[in-house]
Amino acid sequence: MSMEEKLNFQTSQDFSESILKPNNEKAIAETIKYCYKKNIPLEINGLGSKKNIGKNFQSQKTLDLSKYSGIIKYEPEELYIKVKSGTSIKAIKEELDKKNQQLAFEPNDFGSLFDGKSNEGTIGGVLSCNFAGPRRFKVGSARDHVLG
């Protein structure tokens, strides 16, 4: 049994076997541990909004978090939202907008620099890079607004 089968990966037909799409926390953690132990270069990818920034990375495996997305809990009266790391900023903004709320920070949208399409990425990408946009000087960084 291969590692992918063991961890219940759902590999897309459009991608090679080197792209892994786990849909739960256990599979994500076990993939990272496995690649670390075997010294396999691993790229972690959400929507790829920051892929063209910085030095290119040569990896043998890509951990695609697009299947690990969604809003887990939203309490508008408490100004609290819990989401999975692969959740797009667009989806979060749409949910907050329903209750006339917004993110305190303003994630950068690098889409216009690369392909002209808006792409603010995922919450996991924003927090890992700590990009906060033009409001950072007034309201702080993205990580300043995260619990846990």
Language-model-detected regions and their locations in the chain:
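Short beta-strands and strand-loop turn motifs
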Residues: 12-13, 130
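Extended, low-complexity regulatory regions
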Residues: 8-9
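Short Asp/Glu-rich motifs
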Residues: 54, 115-116
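Glycine-rich N-terminal segment of FAD-binding domains in flavoprotein oxidoreductases
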Residues: 13-110
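FAD-binding subdomain of flavoenzyme oxidoreductases
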Residues: 105-106, 116-148
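ATP/NTP phosphate-donor binding region
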Residues: 1-5
